[in-house]
């Protein structure tokens, strides 16, 4: 990610997080690979998947 790009914040429910996590997992599963898509995209998808999973684990630990 470029350091000059702005960061954004959004408010999401845990259901939103679960849906996004599933969507990212499916995108990784069917990712066509390079050179059809840039290889950095796959690394970013892994990062997003892991970040969303950490949120879900945090929710389970603190809310259930």
Indicate where each model-derived feature is located.
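Positively charged, low-complexity terminal tracts
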Residues: 1-64
């Amino acid at each position: 990610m470029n350091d000059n790009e702005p960061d954004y914040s959004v408010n999401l429910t845990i259901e939103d997080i679960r849906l996004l996590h599933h969507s990212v997992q499916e995108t990784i599963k069917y990712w066509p690979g390079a050179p059809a898509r840039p290889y950095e995209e796959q690394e970013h998808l892994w990062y997003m998947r892991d970040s969303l999973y950490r949120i879900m684990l945090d929710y389970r630990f603190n809310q259930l």
